[in-house]
Amino acid sequence: MDFWTAFQAIILGVVEGLTEFLPISSTGHQIIVADLIGFGGERAMAFNIIIQLAAILAVVWEFRSKIFEVVFGLTHQPKARRFTGNLLLAFMPAVVLGVLFADLIHEYLFNPVTVAAALVVGGVIMLWAERRKHRVEVDHVDDMRWSHALKIGFIQCLAMIPGTSRSGSTIIGGLLFGLSRKAATEFSFFLAMPTMVGAAVYSGYKYRDLFQPGDLPVFALGFVTSFIFAMIAVRALLKFIANHSYAAFAWYRIVFGLFILATWQFGWVDWSTAHG
């Protein structure tokens, strides 16, 4: 592994780790940065699976106490069973619709106009949701009802559209359906665990021939970098939302969406090589 390849792995690991759980679309950022540093092709597809898995494992580690509490409480704690049921219920729409439509969406919607439009529209909706007066019904994820979980699960499916942002859709959905910022954000993190692990396993199996032993050092470097920066991002976001709204992220989405349109319009980024 030469210096430039190591640099590419670190940069993309940082981008994935920082953007995966912020409501700003990690996909759009990965495409822009990967093109700018010349990291593409089949190796990039396999590499993306690895760094996404690293990011979700960072969340698993960050919330390990809650996970252990739920797992060991399933047999005797009603709140643990309710939480697990809500998580599975919210997860199912993405499974069904993902299997049915993922390939079609990847083929027909993965273009700069779609990504930019999703970023801008999502940013506008985020601003509206933050400024809209709504009654908080749920302050803690343990107090969610099954109806909250199911609605958030369907909202998460919007993230199949490039540029929407999985975390952005679930967090804003949670806010609109009566969750506090903290509860909506934490449930988004928990919902990411089965959703992203499932997606990584599915993609890993589908593209298993792309994984080559010679790429192991590159993958390992990207994995470690993504894990570390994802943990930093998760902790920072939880602290940020304690005293701030999501308005800053909304404006960032809008600006970034316009930036993507500019890169496409002026040919700064070759979107024809993007793989998602």
From Swiss-Prot:
Pfam families per UniProt: BacA (PF02673)
Reaction(s) catalysed (UniProt annotation): di-trans,octa-cis-undecaprenyl diphosphate + H2O = di-trans,octa-cis-undecaprenyl phosphate + phosphate + H(+)
GO molecular function: undecaprenyl-diphosphatase activity
A single Gene Ontology CC term: plasma membrane
UniProtKB keywords: Antibiotic resistance, Cell inner membrane, Cell membrane, Cell shape, Cell wall biogenesis/degradation, Hydrolase, Membrane, Peptidoglycan synthesis, Transmembrane, Transmembrane helix
Keyword Methyltransferase: no
GO biological process, one term: response to antibiotic
Annotated compartments: Cell inner membrane
Main EC class the enzyme belongs to: hydrolase
Highest taxon above the source species: Bacteria
EC number: 3.6.1.27
Membrane-spanning intervals of the chain: 43-63, 85-105, 109-129, 183-203, 214-234, 249-269
Membrane topology summary: Multi-pass membrane protein
Family assignment from sequence similarity: Belongs to the UppP family.
Role of this protein: Catalyzes the dephosphorylation of undecaprenyl diphosphate (UPP). Confers resistance to bacitracin.
Additional information: Bacitracin is thought to be involved in the inhibition of peptidoglycan synthesis by sequestering undecaprenyl diphosphate, thereby reducing the pool of lipid carrier available.
UniProt name for this protein: Undecaprenyl-diphosphatase
Species name: Pseudomonas putida (strain ATCC 700007 / DSM 6899 / JCM 31910 / BCRC 17059 / LMG 24140 / F1)
